[in-house]
Structure formats: C-alpha cells, structure tokens
C-alpha cells in the first residue's frame, strides 16, 4: 500500500478561517478539544491499520540551505516572509489509494479551532516515494 504524508498548514485555509489566532492564544478548552480530535484521528487510523506516525510541530521554523564549499549554511526564518502559513503537524498514513488519502485529509481539515469551529486547514497530500523492488537475474 502506498504511504502518504498529510502536512497540516495552519492559517492556510480560506477567508476568514485563516485569521484564527495562534493556538497559544486559544481558550484552554479549545486547545483540549483540538488535541482530542487529533488523538481521535490517530485512533481511527490505527483501528483500520492505516496509521504510521503523527506529530505536532512548534511554530518556530528555520530554513537552511547549503552555503558553498567553504561557507557556513545559509539560514532564514522562511523564504516567503509575506506568508503567515506554517506547517503545524503531520500524519504519515499507509492507505489503499490516493482517493483514501484525500478523504482522510478532508476529515483532518475539519478539526476544531477556537469556539469549536472547523479550521478548514489546507492539508498537503504527498505520496512517499518508494524504492524500486529488487530484481533477480534469471540467467
């Protein structure tokens, strides 16, 4: 079965949903409901044998690239300072098809935000590249 990475883009949904404040400014009960939903998703995936891993991420990000043979790495807080998008977390899933990955991504996007309203996060669905199966010589 193919594996997919579901990348959760916080503050990347349609107007006005991308204007939700950062989670550290949510009411405690809203944070608890959001985390409970994430656990619920993981449990559903585990029950179906589709769960591989999941993780939440902090909003702090550092972009790094090779600086050259005798140079230090180049770092920045992001190549696109005009965007307020950040990757808030991810699920790695092992599912039957791309259609199933999209179905799960849509469900994850409905996760509750402040006041219990859906966040409408954009979920980036990325198939994991697989290694070519080993071949045997018939000679």
Q: What kind of region is each of these model predictions?
A:
Residues 1-139:
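Conserved, structured core segments of small domains
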């Amino acid at each position: 079965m193919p594996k997919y990475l579901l990348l959760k883009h916080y503050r990347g949904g349609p107007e006005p949903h991308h204007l939700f404040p950062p989670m550290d400014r949510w009411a405690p009960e809203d944070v608890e409901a959001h985390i409970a939903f994430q656990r619920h998703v993981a449990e559903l995936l585990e029950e179906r044998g589709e769960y591989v891993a999941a993780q939440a991420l902090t909003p702090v990000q550092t972009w790094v690239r090779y600086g050259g043979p005798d140079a230090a790495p180049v770092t920045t807080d992001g190549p696109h300072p005009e965007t307020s998008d950040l990757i808030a977390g991810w699920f790695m899933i092992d599912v039957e098809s791309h259609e199933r990955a999209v179905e799960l991504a849509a469900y994850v996007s409905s996760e509750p935000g402040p006041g219990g309203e859906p966040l409408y996060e954009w979920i980036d669905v990325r198939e994991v590249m697989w290694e070519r199966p080993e071949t045997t010589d018939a000679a």
